[in-house]
């Protein structure tokens, strides 16, 4: 690892390995790195292969030779790809010397690369929340204190605010949620949502899966679980509040009644830069709030009846074991079915609820702490199969969308 100088600044450039380089987080991370050549250098890239032209352009721009592509056909088309196949990203991590591994892969397939990064001793800049949620106890056991630095804006905000007090001074953590594009809609109106509508987030620019998860509030459920795992605060002391402007990213309330909040315009380059350079800040990483003009910041309670995903996540987290992996796997199956037009938007969370209920009733072993990665994968396979059955029985998607208030 790079050693700090006497003034607390990093000595030399940090070597960064970017997993998921062609996605939203990965491309923005490369922008941050390119803008700060005195601080960072890219030593490897990994991607699925769906955006092969983007990956090849990134390889040319960074000059790296260590590249991993999961899709073997895409790797053959690209030529000269040293790591290919389902385990390509994991092998890349194992065979590349890096100070920081940014895991921006999508889905629970990021678990093995996450564990490999922790095993290597590199700092893990974690955007792939699913690997922490699925791996839970395994990931925490593999991590040294402070080795995982979150990339999500909410958890980056919490990490910054928690500097303002000791652990025993924390009363509660407050996650903010924009409410997504369907804030204020009824459950009946949500039945008519189309994938196009669900893909239009009001404040953030994200990848398609994160955008859909934000619309269903599943993303906030995943972030609730991630908050507990990262900071060790019990679930009953983690709140979620709707903040439509997405300026305040999270808050920490302390035992004396004071609350610290982190505020900045919605721009992922800020938490990305902080995760890459932690604990040092990168000057000019993103724009700051402009207090010279009038503005309003609103906060309101989350409607858990219309959007039950957060409370389902709380239940899964409190149950422990592999239940959070089951929550995530069920969502991935149901979300894919919605995007394919096979089920309604509301069926996503209904499927998660069905799978969690079945796990509670028929598979109590899933609440036990997993002994290894295979235990997690077994739980995920069971959850996917159960979710597929639920999807097959769910209400089909409606043909057209409705806007609230329009008959």
From Swiss-Prot:
Q: Which Pfam families match?
A: DXP_redisom_C, DXP_reductoisom, DXPR_C
* Recorded superkingdom: Bacteria
Q: Where does 1-deoxy-D-xylulose 5-phosphate bind?
A: 129, 153-154, 178, 201, 214, 219-220, 223
The record lists the catalysed reaction(s) as:
2-C-methyl-D-erythritol 4-phosphate + NADP(+) = 1-deoxy-D-xylulose 5-phosphate + NADPH + H(+)
Task: Write one Gene Ontology MF term.
Answer: manganese ion binding
Per the UniProt entry, the Enzyme Commission number(s) are: 1.1.1.267
Binding residues for NADPH: 22-25, 48, 51, 128, 130, 207
NCBIfam families assigned to the protein according to its UniProt record, in alphabetical order: Dxr
Q: Which family does it belong to?
A: Belongs to the DXR family.
Q: What is this protein called?
A: 1-deoxy-D-xylulose 5-phosphate reductoisomerase
Question: Top-down, what is the taxonomic lineage of the species of origin?
Answer: Bacteria, Bacillati, Actinomycetota, Actinomycetes, Mycobacteriales
**Encoding gene, per UniProt annotation:** dxr
């Amino acid at each position: 690892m790079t050693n700090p100088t006497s003034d607390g600044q990093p000595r030399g450039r940090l070597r960064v390995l970017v997993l998921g380089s062609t996605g939203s987080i990965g491309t923005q991370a490369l922008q941050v790195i390119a803008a700060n050549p005195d601080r960072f250098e890219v030593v490897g890239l990994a991607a699925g292969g769906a955006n092969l032209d983007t990956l090849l352009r990134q390889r040319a721009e960074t000059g790296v030779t260590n590249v991993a592509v999961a899709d073997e056909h895409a790797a053959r088309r690209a030529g000269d790809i040293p790591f290919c196949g389902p385990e390509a990203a994991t092998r890349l991590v194992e065979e590349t010397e890096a100070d920081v591994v940014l895991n921006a892969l999508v889905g629970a397939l990021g678990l093995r690369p996450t564990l490999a990064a922790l095993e290597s001793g590199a700092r893990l800049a974690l955007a792939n929340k699913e690997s922490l949620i699925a791996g839970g106890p395994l990931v925490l056991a593999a991590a040294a204190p402070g080795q995982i630095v979150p990339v999500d804006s909410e958890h980056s905000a919490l990490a910054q605010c928690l500097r303002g007090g000791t652990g025993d001074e924390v009363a509660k953590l407050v996650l903010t949620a924009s409410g997504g594009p369907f804030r204020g809609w009824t459950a009946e109106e949500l039945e008519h949502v189309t994938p196009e509508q669900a893909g239009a987030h009001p404040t953030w620019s994200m990848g398609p899966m994160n955008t859909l998860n934000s619309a269903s509030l599943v993303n906030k459920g995943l972030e609730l679980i991630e908050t507990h795992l990262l900071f060790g605060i019990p679930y009953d002391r983690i709140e979620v509040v709707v903040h439509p402007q997405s300026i305040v990213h999270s808050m920490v309330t302390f035992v004396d009644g004071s609350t610290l909040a982190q505020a900045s315009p919605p721009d992922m380059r800020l938490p990305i830069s902080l995760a890459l350079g932690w604990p040092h800040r990168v000057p000019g990483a993103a724009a700051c709030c402009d207090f010279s003009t009038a503005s309003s910041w609103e906060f309101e309670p989350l409607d858990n009846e219309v959007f039950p995903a957060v409370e389902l996540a709380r239940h899964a987290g409190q149950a422990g074991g592999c239940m959070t992996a089951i929550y995530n796997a069920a969502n991935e199956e149901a979300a894919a079915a919605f995007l394919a037009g096979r089920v309604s938007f509301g069926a996503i969370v209904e499927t998660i609820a069905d799978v969690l209920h079945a796990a509670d009733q028929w598979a109590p072993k899933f609440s036990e702490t997993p002994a290894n990665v295979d235990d997690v994968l077994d739980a995920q396979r069971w959850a996917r199969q159960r979710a597929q059955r639920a999807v097959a029985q769910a209400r089909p998607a409606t043909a057209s969308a409705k806007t609230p208030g329009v008959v």
